[in-house]
């Protein structure tokens, strides 16, 4: 059975990734350079953009986020929730890691590294903001790129689709209280009105619009759906890159003064990626799930819905905040780190199947 999203059941090589996806780290580095240069050359322009707000929501960023996330959410078939029961153990592992381990482990790592061990190397007035950004990054499971990672490992397409649909359904109601709770226990003031507004603007409304668009496109046939997705898919990356240019135009001066900050913020993110992916992979093996289920389960546990994290950080704390910078570090390292995780799970298949009690794929 083929999933409607076009997720291919066959194992794939690097061709499964578009040029934009494959070289995302390069594009992010270019955005850093372009943003810093433009911010230094035309500060009044970016100050004007930063002031284009209504109810603490920056209008240009709001538009860019919609362009960024709606094409991704169109791929999500919430009808796949009916497939959850077919791999209930794998789904259980996914939910456990994504909602009970990942956000809390990131909060702990941020507290250890940012508030304590790295604190002497960081600007004191931004430490809370950095921690908030890391929490936002870990609080939303990956939506779009997990389809790519799953294809690269020969993951079960229906399981991948069902876990994304379930995670996105949970995210609609759980993102705000989870972020609010973790920020609260981290002694960071929670702007609840802005947080709830962000959830409505960047999760609820895009999900509704995306599903209406999905239904309309599928009514015209699968070929129309696939052709439209191929056309609008690059919009997401373009909107992300423009957002990053804006962000680094505001952050440029701080980065030039303390370039080490990006490397320090990457440390807890890297630890979290490898810890959560390894935990999910091992748990799936322990409960006897197939390798084709364990791979996407481990990968969604390792990656983040960084587009939402960037949007929420800007709305809650502003362009100039350490929170916004912390979420962008997640974007910067996403592709190379996830490709390494893909390599590990692909090359450990023999070890996995020797220990799994369920029949292998």
Q: In which residue ranges do the predicted regions lie?
A:
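Alpha-helical transmembrane segments of multi-pass small-molecule/ion transporters
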Residues: 1-75, 79-302, 306-361
């Amino acid at each position: 059975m083929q999933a409607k999203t076009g997720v291919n059941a066959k194992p794939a090589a690097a061709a499964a990734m578009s040029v934009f996806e494959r070289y995302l780290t390069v594009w992010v580095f270019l955005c850093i350079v372009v943003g810093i240069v433009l911010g230094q050359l035309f500060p009044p322009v970016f100050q004007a953009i930063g002031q284009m707000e209504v109810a603490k929501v920056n209008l240009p960023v709001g538009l860019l986020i919609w362009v960024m996330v709606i094409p991704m959410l169109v791929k999500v078939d919430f009808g796949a929730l009916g497939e959850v029961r077919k791999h209930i153990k794998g789904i259980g592992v996914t939910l456990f890691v994504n909602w009970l381990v990942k956000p809390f482990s990131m909060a702990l790592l941020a507290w250890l590294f940012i508030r304590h061990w790295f604190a002497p190397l960081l600007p004191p007035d931004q430490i809370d903001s950095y921690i908030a950004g890391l929490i936002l990054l870990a609080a939303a499971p990956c939506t779009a790129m997990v389809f790519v990672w799953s294809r690269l490992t020969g993951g079960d397409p229906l399981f991948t689709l069902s876990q994304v649909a379930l995670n996105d359904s949970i995210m609609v109601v759980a993102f705000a209280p989870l972020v609010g709770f973790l920020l609260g226990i981290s002694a960071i003031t929670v702007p609840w009105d802005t947080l709830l507004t962000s959830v409505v603007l960047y999760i609820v409304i895009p999900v509704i619009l995306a599903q209406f668009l999905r239904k309309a496109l599928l009514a015209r046939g699968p070929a129309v759906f696939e052709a439209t997705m191929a056309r609008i898919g690059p919009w997401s990356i373009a909107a992300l890159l423009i957002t990053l240019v804006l962000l680094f135009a505001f952050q440029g001066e701080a980065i030039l003064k303390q370039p080490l900050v990006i490397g320090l913020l990457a440390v807890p993110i890297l630890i979290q990626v490898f810890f959560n992916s390894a935990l999910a992979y091992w748990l799936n093996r322990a409960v006897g799930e197939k390798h084709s289920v364990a791979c996407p389960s481990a990968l969604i546990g390792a990656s983040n819905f960084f587009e939402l994290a960037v949007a929420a950080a800007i709305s809650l704390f502003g362009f100039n905040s350490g929170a916004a910078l912390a979420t962008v570090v997640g974007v910067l390292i996403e592709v190379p780190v996830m490709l390494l995780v893909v390599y590990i799970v692909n090359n450990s298949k023999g070890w996995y199947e020797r220990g799994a009690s369920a029949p292998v794929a």
